[in-house]
Amino acid sequence: MNSKMLKHLRLATLSFSMFFGIVSSPAVYALGAGNPAAPVLPGVNPEQTGWCAFQLCNSYDLFAALAGSLKFGFYGDYVFSESAHITNVPVITSVTTSGTGTTPTITSTTKNVDFDLNNSSISSSCVFATIALQETSPAAIPLLDIAFTARVGGLKQYYRLPLNAYRDFTSNPLNAESEVTDGLIEVQSDYGIVWGLSLQKVLWKDGVSFVGVSADYRHGSSPINYIIVYNKANPEIYFDATDGNLSYKEWSASIGISTYLNDYVLPYASVSIGNTSRKAPSDSFTELEKQFTNFKFKIRKITNFDRVNFCFGTTCCISNNFYYSVEGRWGYQRAINITSGLQF
């Protein structure tokens, strides 16, 4: 079998294997996975000894088989929409009073309700630095081929969700305003600081194909630009403001496979699992509560659904010192990730 046909066969096997793994996963979700071969890119590894070469290192001198590199570049992650919600919001379904006098007994019945986000988007642009340790031996299962990455940059957030998700219905059950409404809350932040850490490891390689894993953590805090509260039935719009920040936390772990399509292009596919959460400042609706004394709010955490998220991307190694990757992901997030870097 010639080398060109072998590369196409590996690419077909890659696509089928990742698709099967994706559809059989019950609850997977996360941020961009990145190319599984990232620790050894953009340089080309030496040819390995074969698919079944179960060799760890062929040198008695471990350091003679190692090489290192330093990478700097740009990392952009842009989420256009996501499936997220606020869960277990207690809503008053009925109120009864008993007893006489000035302090009757009030009994209320509540029901926990989940509220989904109507719209959301996240924009993150960072610079990164990576320290990579590559193994130059022909081992199929390398001891190292590992990369550590630190990122810092800006994060901007936007979301809109039902007003009832932030309502405090239980503070005064007798108030008519405690009934469920059809209002909406819209929150947008300015750019704030975000930082992230990443660890990537190649598990297996044969000189053309790679299997790797990664773990990522991202933490951001963005100052609030505006908060809008309005009701669909009544054309009333209220603006609120806060000096606090909109927090954002996300972690993920992924496994993926990549292969050389030609000497410069490596398509890849990955599956990842993780969690995302964000929370508005506790004083987000202070001014609105002053205007309406019977209108109470409670800030709750926004979390994602348990749904499948899968990533497909391509890395282009233009030279031995420069590369870029474009990745799209679908599932709980609909997003695009762009990474480019220089190796020294």
From Swiss-Prot:
One of its GO terms (cellular component) is symbiont-containing vacuole. The keyword Isomerase does not apply. GO terms for molecular function: porin activity. It is a multi-pass membrane protein. Residues 1-30 form the signal peptide. It is found in: Cell outer membrane. GO terms for biological process: monoatomic ion transport. Keywords: Cell outer membrane, Ion transport, Membrane, Porin, Signal, Transmembrane, Transmembrane beta strand, Transport. The keyword Ubl conjugation does not apply. Belongs to the chlamydial OMP family. This is Outer membrane protein B. It comes from Chlamydia pneumoniae. The gene is ompB.
